[in-house]
């Protein structure tokens, strides 16, 4: 049985970049664990803000945190009070100078992580999983998606035996490296147990810039002779 590679990791260095951008020798494991802690802290505190990802850059004694969110107002707060509190909390956790940058996600229907969390919230409100999947797929396709695929696993509808249900529309080519495939995962805590949601969204193709091939010697001679 074939297993699927993570679509984001598969495209790093081709059409995607790392979410953590720094270099370390001996402190690598400590900084890696610190990144995980920072992301978990931000995600847990502002779960309702629809956070897609948190990018972390380190230079010396400074940390630059970029939060990609669908609802920046929740993180900023009235008069910027919430973001200042967050800045202080992160500085206390890391003992370093922290700079926070917030980027708004204009089309949350095209972000796989936000879509997965939205489906999870619907399942926790006891909405039928089929209805939740169908509505979500329709919204994404209307927003300009080339294709979307959703997988929901667990005791669906309170069934005794766990199973996986799929719903897909359009094209989602997982092995086409130039295809901008976004992937998201979320969990819904229901009365019957946890239900896992996976979402793949095809947002089109990212083509590399066309490189001019050097002209061959014979071609150059012919062009010069023609002049």
UniProtKB/Swiss-Prot annotation:
The keyword Ribonucleoprotein applies. InterPro entries: KH_dom, KH_dom-like_a/b, KH_dom_type_2, KH_sf_prok-type, Ribosomal_S3_C_sf, Ribosomal_uS3_bac-typ, Ribosomal_uS3_C, Ribosomal_uS3_CS. GO terms for biological process: translation. The keyword Kinase does not apply. Coiled coil: none annotated. GO terms for cellular component: cytosolic small ribosomal subunit. One of its GO terms (molecular function) is rRNA binding. Keywords: Ribonucleoprotein, Ribosomal protein, RNA-binding, rRNA-binding. Residues 38-106 form the KH type-2 domain. Pfam families: KH_2, Ribosomal_S3_C. Binds the lower part of the 30S subunit head. Binds mRNA in the 70S ribosome, positioning it for translation. Belongs to the universal ribosomal protein uS3 family. Part of the 30S ribosomal subunit. Forms a tight complex with proteins S10 and S14. This is Small ribosomal subunit protein uS3. It comes from Syntrophomonas wolfei subsp. wolfei (strain DSM 2245B / Goettingen). The gene is rpsC.
């Amino acid at each position: 049985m074939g297993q699927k590679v993570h679509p984001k990791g598969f495209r790093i260095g081709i059409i995607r970049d790392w979410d953590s951008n720094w270099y370390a020798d001996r402190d690598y494991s400590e900084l890696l664990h610190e990144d995980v802690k920072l992301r978990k802290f931000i995600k847990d505190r502002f779960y309702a803000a629809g956070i897609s990802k948190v990018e972390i850059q380190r230079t010396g004694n400074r940390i630059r945190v970029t939060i990609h969110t669908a609802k920046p107002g929740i993180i900023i707060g009235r008069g910027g009070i919430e973001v200042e509190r967050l800045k202080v909390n992160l500085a206390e956790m890391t003992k370093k100078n922290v700079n926070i940058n917030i980027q708004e996600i204009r089309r949350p229907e095209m972000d796989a992580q936000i879509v997965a969390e939205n489906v999870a919230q619907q399942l926790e409100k006891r909405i039928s999983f089929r209805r939740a999947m169908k509505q979500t797929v329709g919204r994404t396709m209307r927003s300009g998606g080339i294709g979307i695929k959703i997988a929901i696993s667990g005791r669906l509808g309170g069934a005794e035996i766990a199973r996986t249900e799929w719903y897909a529309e359009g094209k989602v080519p997982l092995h086409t490296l130039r295809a901008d495939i976004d992937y998201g995962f979320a969990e819904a805590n229901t009365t019957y147990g946890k239900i896992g949601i996976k979402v793949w969204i095809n947002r089109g193709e990212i083509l590399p810039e066309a490189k001019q091939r050097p002209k061959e010697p014979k071609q150059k001679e012919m062009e010069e002779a023609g002049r």
